[in-house]
Amino acid sequence: MQDFLPFSRPAIGDAEISAVCDVLKSGWITTGPKNHELEQQFCDTFGCQHAVALCSATAGMHVTLLALGIGPGDEVITPSQTWVSTINIITLLGAEPVFVDVDPDTLMTSAELIAPLITANTKAIIPVHYAGAPVDLDPILALARRHGIAVIEDAAHAVGTRYRERWIGASGTAIFSFHAIKNLTCAEGGMLVTDDKALADKVRMLKFHGLGVDAFDRMSLGRKPQAEVITPGFKYNLADINAAIALVQLARLPELNAKRAELVARYQERLAGLPLAPLAVPGYPHLHTWHLFMVRVDPDRCGLDRDQLMQALQERGIGTGLHFRAAHTQKYYRERYPTLSLPHTEWNSSRLCTLPLFPDMTLADVDRVVAALIDILE
């Protein structure tokens, strides 16, 4: 029997392992020089003005919303077709998530869908770049400017993505994820980027106990060990062990993303004619980084549902993923918003299936997945 093919696997090589060993030998393994280097390299690569490394994108969303003063009585517009962490953070802050539907084929929202949901209580919009493609940002930013509303881009899927002529993160405020399955990984980690210095400074303070400095700063700059708390904060800093991995991955990112694109081209060629429906590619100029490759499994066309297809692939030694079950269909939110209806989100949520895609895959692996799909569907 062939080896099991997972839907994702991190592309970790000798350079990443060597970088970790160097940090372990350095005597400084928590937040330190590698963090500062990563933040600077991220800015240099993508044209960001300010970057703050964090232990996760979820942590980044938490402290960013806090820094913007989001709290009870406020509304935050965001898609339900996303990972639940954003919705959880909004809810935990006492604010109200206002769910917006998405385009049925790109799974991204739009200014046209957002506009009717804006009220006097709307304080932020969180559009989601999806699966490696950029949301159509300019109309959303223009809408937000007219109403004086903050925009926080959920760029967890979009490291290395371009929208029109600019990198995601080059302007405005965006949050990236370095989770284990992401295009750039350090096991766990994230990055806030922004062109708002005051926001960056506040996030930097909130991410480390409200001190505004980390342990390395206090030692290297000769500050007193008893740095003062300016405001209550959290411990959301990234260790240098993780930052060292991220630095290597950042240097490799063009190569890793190019391999993903090559694999997707093979999928697109071989899946043509099958009753599966891949996500549509946006029509505006962009560079897609193919974080995920998803198809929709419509029982009326395929003769079986998504869960049955996933089980059949599992039995053939092929892993799949689900990105994502819509947040408002989860138990807590389903009970809190029993009358909420998002037709495009709900149709896709019950049909989405993520096929294997990672840089260490081969074209033969893609052919194996497609052969299994043909066998199952025919």
UniProtKB/Swiss-Prot annotation:
Swiss-Prot/TrEMBL cofactor(s): pyridoxal 5'-phosphate
Reaction catalysis annotation: UDP-4-amino-4-deoxy-beta-L-arabinose + 2-oxoglutarate = UDP-beta-L-threo-pentopyranos-4-ulose + L-glutamate
PTM sites of type N6-(pyridoxal phosphate)lysine: K182
Group of enzyme by EC: transferase
GO MF terms held by the record: pyridoxal phosphate binding; UDP-4-amino-4-deoxy-L-arabinose aminotransferase
Pathway, per record: Nucleotide-sugar biosynthesis; UDP-4-deoxy-4-formamido-beta-L-arabinose biosynthesis; UDP-4-deoxy-4-formamido-beta-L-arabinose from UDP-alpha-D-glucuronate: step 2/3; Bacterial outer membrane biogenesis; lipopolysaccharide biosynthesis
Enzyme Commission (EC) number: 2.6.1.87
Keywords, sorted A to Z: Aminotransferase, Antibiotic resistance, Lipid A biosynthesis, Lipid biosynthesis, Lipid metabolism, Lipopolysaccharide biosynthesis, Pyridoxal phosphate, Transferase
Annotated GO biological process: lipid A biosynthetic process; lipopolysaccharide biosynthetic process; response to antibiotic
Quaternary structure and partners: Homodimer.
HAMAP family referenced in this protein's UniProt entry, alphabetically: ArnB_transfer
Family, similarity comment: Belongs to the DegT/DnrJ/EryC1 family. ArnB subfamily.
Name of protein: UDP-4-amino-4-deoxy-L-arabinose--oxoglutarate aminotransferase
Gene that this polypeptide is encoded by: arnB
